[in-house]
Structures are given as structure tokens and as C-alpha cells.
A protein has these predicted regions:
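Conserved ABC ATPase "signature" region
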Residues: 71-72, 113, 120-137
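Catalytic Walker B motif of ABC-type/P-loop ATPase nucleotide-binding domains
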Residues: 167-170
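Short coil-to-helix segment of the ABC ATPase nucleotide-binding domain corresponding to the Q-loop/switch region
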Residues: 102-111
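The feature captures the beta-strand-to-loop junction immediately N-terminal to the Walker
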Residues: 41-43
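Conserved ABC ATPase signature
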Residues: 142-152
Length: 286
């Protein structure tokens, strides 16, 4: 029997406000196999975002078991959980979450920097991803120079940088116009066809209809889990996104990571000269 990629058993997540406890998730049991395309749908406050955060190792469950490819996450410390998140997951957010002072290339490279992948391989991988997503002419553009659809394609490339075995897409078309939203969904369908596990988190039935399995969440509980018949779109051979990065050893030591962080910080300072000057004056003058 094939081992599930993601397996949640009896997952509960509670939050405390003052002397009151709020249950965001209640005894969730869910299995997602490798290569599935799943939509988690629910209204605002349904618990779908909390479920996504636990699936993506962005949060801990209060109770229950969560296994990723058989590995129990319950007792992992923050560092171990971050490494698991880095190795398995790529994230696509509604508001893109790109660093405004960095180019498209540098934004895409960020996950690989934290993974310790050498610069030449990072650069080649980022260029390849952006080119396949139609952004080869925008490598040096900052987010403010890109349209919403282009920014979301940069975030997709970033999600794939370390392989993105599981793509977690939180309202991926929510901030886009109709045409850009369709293009983003077409890319996600292609990634699914290439073997990625794709999990959509949405309130929109039209977005959920792209998945082969739809899970409805309400008041922290799973109301239904059903298969869905859908039509799929394909990218042309020229547009297909490379599914996995080339095999590499993670050779960059902590000194190299410090150098990269320093370079990023320097770019941020140069990009905001006036703010930097005023800050320095405030320090000097007191």
C-alpha cells in the first residue's frame, strides 16, 4: 500500500483570547496522496487558512498527528519544521508577498539561498523558471514594474525554486483580473500534470472546480470530501514549466548565507536612499 504524502489524524487547533478558547479546527482527518490536485473551499472564518498553515508547516496543531511522507511533525522544533517546509512546499499567495526592493530574479532565488544552493545553479534555475513562465524579458524588473499577473507568475517561479513537490496556493487568483486568473490556473494545472501535488485554498467555487478533489470546510470541520470531474488545460511544449530543479549538493556555508543576506540588505538600503539618510541622521543627531 502506497504511503500517503500528507496525513492528518485528529488535528485540532485552538486559540486563546483572554479566558476564552476558540477552536479553529476540530478533529480533522485528511489524507492527500502524491500527485493529487485538491481544493479546500470554505467561507471566511471556516478554518481553511488555518488548515493550510498546518499543512504547509507554518503552524503547529494543538492536538493530533500530522505526517509528511511518513514523518511525524508533532515533536519537531522550529528549525526542523522549517527544513521540512523548505524541502517539500512551495507557496503561492493572493498578494504575492514579493520583496519590493528585489528584482524578479532575486525574489525567485530567495528559497534557494536559504537552502544553501550555490549561486550559479540558483541563477540558472531562476532564469529557466521565469523564461518558461513568459518573464524572460523581466528578469531585472522589481514588483512595482510588473502587472498583477506577472507578479503572481514570479511567485509561482519562487514556489518552484526548490522543487515545490507540494504547491500550496492560497486564493491564487483573488487579486487578478479574469484573463490573468485563467492564466495562473492554467499554469497550476500544468504543474499538476507534471507530477506536483497542488492544493488550492479558496472561497470561489469556480477556482475549486479546477481540482480533481474538493474538500469543503465550515466552522473548523470537514463537511464533504468528493471527487470532481474537470476539464484540464495544457501549456504548449515551449511554455511548460520545469518541474524539478537539477540535483545539487547544498554547499553554501553559513558565511555564504551571511554574504547573501548582506547583499540583499545593501540593495534595500540603496533602493531607499532618502529613508536611509533620514534614519542615519536620526541616529547621529539623536
Amino acid at each position: 500500500m502506497t504511503q500517503p504524502l500528507l496525513q492528518l489524524t485528529g488535528i485540532t487547533r485552538s486559540f486563546t483570547a483572554g479566558d476564552r478558547e476558540f477552536l479553529a479546527l476540530k478533529n480533522i482527518n485528511l489524507t492527500i496522496n502524491a500527485g493529487e490536485m485538491v481544493a479546500i473551499i470554505g467561507a471566511s472564518g471556516s478554518g481553511k487558512s488555518t488548515l493550510m498553515n498546518i499543512l504547509g508547516c507554518l503552524d503547529y496543531a494543538t492536538a493530533g498527528s500530522y505526517r509528511i511522507n511518513g514523518q511525524e511533525t508533532r515533536d519537531l522544533d522550529d528549525q526542523a519544521l522549517a527544513e521540512l517546509r523548505r524541502d517539500y512546499f512551495g507557496f503561492i499567495f493572493q498578494r504575492y508577498h514579493l520583496l519590493p526592493h528585489l528584482s524578479a530574479m532575486h525574489n525567485v532565488e530567495m528559497p534557494a539561498i536559504y537552502a544553501g544552493i550555490p549561486a550559479p545553479q540558483r541563477h540558472a534555475r531562476a532564469r529557466e523558471l521565469l523564461a518558461r513562465l513568459g518573464l524572460d524579458g523581466h528578469l531585472t524588473h522589481r514588483p512595482s514594474q510588473l502587472s498583477g499577473g506577472q507578479q503572481q507568475r514570479v511567485s509561482i517561479a519562487r514556489a518552484l525554486m526548490n522543487g515545490g513537490e507540494v504547491i500550496l496556493a492560497d486564493e491564487p487568483t483573488g487579486a487578478l483580473d479574469t484573463a490573468s486568473g485563467k492564466e495562473v490556473m492554467r499554469i497550476l494545472l500544468e504543474l499538476h500534470a507534471a507530477g506536483h501535488t497542488v492544493i488550492l485554498v479558496t472561497h470561489d467555487p469556480k477556482v475549486a472546480a479546477n481540482a480533481e478533489r474538493i474538500i469543503e470546510v465550515s466552522d473548523g470541520e470537514i463537511l464533504s470530501d468528493r471527487r470532481n470531474q474537470r476539464d484540464t488545460g495544457q501549456l504548449s511544449d515551449e511554455e511548460q514549466v520545469p518541474a524539478k530543479p537539477p540535483a545539487t549538493r547544498r554547499l553554501v556555508a553559513s558565511l555564504g548565507l551571511f554574504k547573501e543576506a548582506f547583499n540583499m540588505a545593501w540593495v534595500a538600503l540603496i533602493s531607499h536612499r532618502m529613508r536611509t539618510l533620514l534614519t542615519m541622521l536620526g541616529i547621529v543627531i539623536g
